[in-house]
């Protein structure tokens, strides 16, 4: 077959295959047009699930008479005019494809009147030919679009439509999503002449919470934590549900970029990562999130239905979202919103800047992002329970090197291993003479045999065997790293701002030299009782820095050793599940030891006595 240029009619029907998937797609495109036209009231009338009639009526600016026919032409739009406009899109629509695509698979009537005209005009088009008829009509300022007999000329598409109930459920979900994003707009949705949804315009907090409750349910609002998180041009706001309000299906997840509803993999991953410590893979978080950023930093022209976007700085956006949600989830003082309340619980001081409020929060392990997170924990007593996380059940299985046969551990060794795990203090090897102790410090005569239940290394030195706790080994490595001269530092991508209460300020004056000594770099603003964290020790880069600092500043630590011990107790340790990683940890720790510190490693060894076991053989 020879190559030919497709006719406009065929091209429009092909485009309709991308834009018009089902009646809900038509509703989405037309309601977004109404929003772009500045409408404050939008009515959506549906008959028979949208297959018979879809009518969208708004009070927007309207379309002039001489532009009505042009509005149905393909690639005709008032929203962009140049390539520069394409890089700076804030409108919901911009391609000029929707009306042309819809009219090519339906009988479409467009009636409109701008405020500058005394009378309204109506244009009608149907099917493949798309010939338009213009005539006067009676209509208030605004626009009405009627789409009748959807897919009447494409039977193959029409037979794929589901039942009226199913198709209307999809339309209802589209309106719910749009209504969450556009709180100031009133929406009325009818089906077969009956009002199904009616969302009044919401301007203050009480009204907005009522709309969220109407769409997401009262239980969501009662378990929701508010987020208001800013950094430069990035702004994250909305509500996230507490982990206890998890879902078995992904039915309460609403995310918007500059007011546009999206389903983006980067955002989804960031949200899942923020909830990783709280939810299992079978559980889903519930959230309503609004992300606002410079339109130049996001490309919305990457998907036929505009459901996906592409960020120019994906890592920054990912970390910013993850950090903001983590802060809310980890904050003991996060506010629970009640359906009959319009304000958050006043358990803490709120930092106000311009017209935004910043919520107190703690972060999960630093994802290379933090924002203007300003808080005051004057009413909080440090508690270890605050920082506990749900550990996932893992299958504990010993890992052995390839050249070492697997052997069964006797009850004697199991008892010694249990003692190692139950003892939170550093274990000391007592029945050793100085010569043997010094000999054991030599790395060359130590052999790492196996990883035992992902918690300890089984070591051999000549005829002696030892268990070495991986948790204690990790703490020792971090402690040694913080005592290096100089300490390796890394700058924070987004500085963390702390607002201190008087008690914390006192402890800060006491401990700030200790912070500097181990590689932290703060900027002080004592007049406003603020400190800003700018640089951190490299070994703590992935730690929950806010949690660590709050714990340190909540108690008197008058000596450096006490300060360092407290910090090492707070840090979150990595779960090591691979034998090679455990050996690497041991090697890196040994490299940090100097001659005076060599005994520190030996003190962690628990000797295993095989003699009683061997005598029974």
UniProtKB/Swiss-Prot annotation:
Gene Ontology terms for molecular function? ATP binding; ATP hydrolysis activity; ATP-dependent DNA damage sensor activity; mismatched DNA binding
Q: Which InterPro entries match?
A: DNA_mismatch_repair_CS, DNA_mismatch_repair_MutL, DNA_mismatch_S5_2-like, HATPase_C_sf, MutL/Mlh/PMS, MutL/Mlh/Pms-like, MutL_C, MutL_C_dimsub
What biological-process GO terms show up in the record? mismatch repair
Q: Has keyword DNA repair?
A: yes
SUPFAM superfamilies in the cross-refs: ATPase domain of HSP90 chaperone/DNA topoisomerase II/histidine kinase, DNA mismatch repair protein MutL, Ribosomal protein S5 domain 2-like
A UniProt-annotated Pfam family:
MutL_C
Q: Name one GO cellular component term.
A: mismatch repair complex
Keywords on record: DNA damage, DNA repair
Secretion signal: which residues? none
Protein family membership: Belongs to the DNA mismatch repair MutL/HexB family.
PANTHER family hit by this protein: DNA MISMATCH REPAIR PROTEIN MLH, PMS, MUTL, DNA MISMATCH REPAIR PROTEIN MLH1
Function text = This protein is involved in the repair of mismatches in DNA. It is required for dam-dependent methyl-directed DNA mismatch repair. May act as a 'molecular matchmaker', a protein that promotes the formation of a stable complex between two or more DNA-binding proteins in an ATP-dependent manner without itself being part of a final effector complex.
What is the protein's given name? DNA mismatch repair protein MutL
Q: Which gene encodes it?
A: mutL
